[in-house]
């Protein structure tokens, strides 16, 4: 690969200040840029903003390291840490663009995050998921999808038969995420010929 790999950071669109997820997302942004990756996200608040803030705090950050794929038609809706805002006008359909990055890291998240996880799984992307220490939700309500899917397969299809142990890789720290990316990303670099073909 003759470019910086682009890693999607997905998750909650709003977060409580100093929550476990906000702290992790910010640390993740710093660690990714420091390790030589670019970040792509949905460009708005919550996990997206925390990851961007962390990216800007990296000692090797440079302009262009944080890409935001916005659901609306105006780039001005982007959070202040987005270097390259892409205003798609696609609403939630923009989730496919985010998911078709080189790898995807989920931090909590609701149904929008679940759609991105599903797209990434179908597209055979490397997927990492934060094991949220105290996940939200109840027996009747799914929440914090990263905690639910961590260390599991999203369905019963053998999407990458050449990769032993293929699954959503659970992580507890930003360092875990960077280490798994370094080890696993080369295995997932190929892409399906077209969407839906398995």
Q: What are the residue ranges of the model-derived segments?
A:
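Generic N-terminal amphipathic, Lys/Arg-enriched alpha-helix
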Residues: 2-19, 29-30, 34-35
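Acidic/glycine-enriched connector segments
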Residues: 23-26, 30-33, 41, 45-119, ...
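Structured adenosyl-cofactor binding patch, chiefly the S-adenosyl-L-methionine
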Residues: 141-154, 167-168, 173
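C-terminal amphipathic helix plus adjacent low-complexity
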Residues: 179-198
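Short, conserved catalytic or adaptor-binding loops enriched in Gly and charged residues
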Residues: 77-79, 154-164
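Short acidic-hydrophobic, aromatic-tinged amphipathic segments that line or gate anion-handling sites
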Residues: 85-89, 164-180
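Flexible, glycine/charged-enriched surface loops at secondary-structure junctions
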Residues: 42, 166, 192-194
